[in-house]
């Protein structure tokens, strides 16, 4: 299986399966001289850890990270950073009943079509548990970017038909962890919690939209034509399980606007070139403008639901039905926020190194 590596100069390789012994990541390209510890990584992993609230799976995993290489006396050495997390609460027997019946909305059928076999225990490699490696690698990317004044704020903008009101970057950072649904509009968050609770009782699930704001990115970041910054952000977010759509700035709304409405007029502010609006979402021609980069990912409802669904029996090739049991998230967006933040951090860190905005030697000066 290929496709386990992401990035060019700042590169991660994730490994492991949902019900295997462990999952982890190898990070290549982290410059020498960055102070970090297991606590820095653990802080991010704890944000995506299951079993913490009524909006996540009841699977209980400590998700304690172990750093195996790439660090000496509390600093990165410039060599590969290898990290792992042991799986401890996998209940594989719950998945025996679906061994020969592909779950609607899951990768069961497509993995069989591609590889001729699949690990049916929790989805194997296609499980969202793979994202532990992304979050661990992204934690290092976020630490690196913070040294250069780049910060990332993610939150749940929509859950089903419920949408948060417009909020500032600072409000998102302040409020996002105050509620299990990670919606920074606390009034909307309460309604979202009620909706999730009702759907859980019904054996159903709900999707939503995760919004990300990246602040502090300098103008001039990006590698046209095929390595456009927005294209790489789209790939990063679309690679996350359950993501079905991506937009940046005005996004699909841009198709409904006139040019006079969509264009962001240039002006001088405090001696610097800026724009009076940001419909472009901080990127023009695949290159950053210096304004906030604003992008969103559309997340489908959790496909594992308790309702009876139509499927097929792979052995008999007959139609049948399935009602999925086990421990599953009633909604994905809240736990996806730290994963999405990690992925965009990896993209920005990679481009900062590729463009020369980060000189690997400067961390030691």
Curated annotation (Swiss-Prot):
Residues where FMN binds: 125-127, 285, 300-304, 327
Gene Ontology biological process terms from the UniProt entry: amino acid biosynthetic process; aromatic amino acid family biosynthetic process; chorismate biosynthetic process
Class of this enzyme: lyase
Entry similarity comment: Belongs to the chorismate synthase family.
SUPFAM superfamilies found in the cross-reference section: Chorismate synthase, AroC (SSF103263)
Annotated pathway: Metabolic intermediate biosynthesis; chorismate biosynthesis; chorismate from D-erythrose 4-phosphate and phosphoenolpyruvate: step 7/7
Catalytic activity: 5-O-(1-carboxyvinyl)-3-phosphoshikimate = chorismate + phosphate
Cofactor section: FMNH2
Catalytic activity, EC: 4.2.3.5
UniProt: NADP(+) binding residues: 48
Gene Ontology annotations for the cellular component aspect, listed alphabetically: cytosol
Gene3D superfamilies the record matches: Chorismate synthase AroC
Entries under HAMAP family matching the protein: Chorismate_synth
Chain positions covered by the region annotation Disordered: 41-61
Organism: Methanosarcina barkeri (strain Fusaro / DSM 804)
General function of this protein: This reaction introduces a second double bond into the aromatic ring system.
Protein keywords: Amino-acid biosynthesis, Aromatic amino acid biosynthesis, FAD, Flavoprotein, FMN, Lyase, NADP
Gene Ontology terms, MF aspect: chorismate synthase activity; FMN binding
Domain of life, per lineage: Archaea
Protein name per its UniProtKB record: Chorismate synthase
Co-factor note (free text): Reduced FMN (FMNH(2)).
């Amino acid at each position: 299986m290929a496709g386990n590596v992401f990035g060019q100069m700042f590169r991660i390789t994730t490994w492991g399966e949902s019900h295997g012994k462990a999952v982890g990541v190898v990070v290549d390209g982290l410059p020498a001289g960055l102070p970090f510890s297991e606590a820095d990584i653990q802080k991010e992993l704890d944000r995506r850890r299951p079993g913490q609230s009524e909006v996540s799976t009841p699977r209980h995993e400590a998700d304690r990270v172990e750093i195996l290489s790439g660090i000496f006396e509390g600093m990165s050495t410039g060599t590969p950073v290898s990290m792992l997390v042991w799986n401890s609460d996998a209940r594989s027997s719950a998945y025996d009943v679906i061994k020969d019946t592909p779950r609607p909305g899951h990768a069961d059928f497509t993995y069989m079509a591609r590889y001729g076999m699949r690990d049916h225990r929790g989805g194997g490699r296609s499980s969202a548990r793979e994202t532990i490696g992304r979050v661990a690698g992204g934690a290092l990317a976020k630490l690196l970017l913070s040294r250069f004044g780049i910060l990332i704020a993610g939150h749940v903008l929509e859950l089903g038909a419920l949408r948060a009101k417009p909020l500032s970057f600072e409000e998102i950072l302040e409020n996002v962890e105050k509620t299990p649904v990670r919606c920074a509009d606390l009034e909307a968050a309460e309604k979202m919690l009620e909706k999730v609770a009702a759907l859980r009782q019904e054996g159903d699930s709900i999707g939503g939209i995760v919004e990300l704001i990246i602040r502090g990115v300098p103008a001039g970041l990006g590698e046209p034509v095929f390595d456009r910054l927005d294209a790489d952000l789209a790939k990063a977010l679309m690679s996350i399980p359950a993501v079905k759509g991506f937009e940046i700035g005005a996004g699909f709304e841009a198709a409904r606007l006139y040019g006079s409405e969509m264009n962001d007029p240039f002006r001088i502010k405090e001696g610097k070139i800026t724009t009076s609006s940001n419909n472009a979402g901080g990127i023009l021609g695949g290159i950053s403008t210096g304004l906030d980069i604003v992008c969103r990912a559309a997340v489908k409802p959790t496909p594992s639901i308790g309702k009876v669904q139509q499927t097929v029996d792979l052995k008999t090739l007959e139609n049948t039905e399935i009602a999925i049991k086990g421990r599953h998230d009633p909604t994905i967006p809240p736990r996806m926020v730290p994963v999405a933040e990690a992925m965009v951090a990896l993209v920005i860190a990679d481009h900062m190194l590729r463009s020369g905005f980060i000189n690997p030697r400067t961390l030691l000066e």
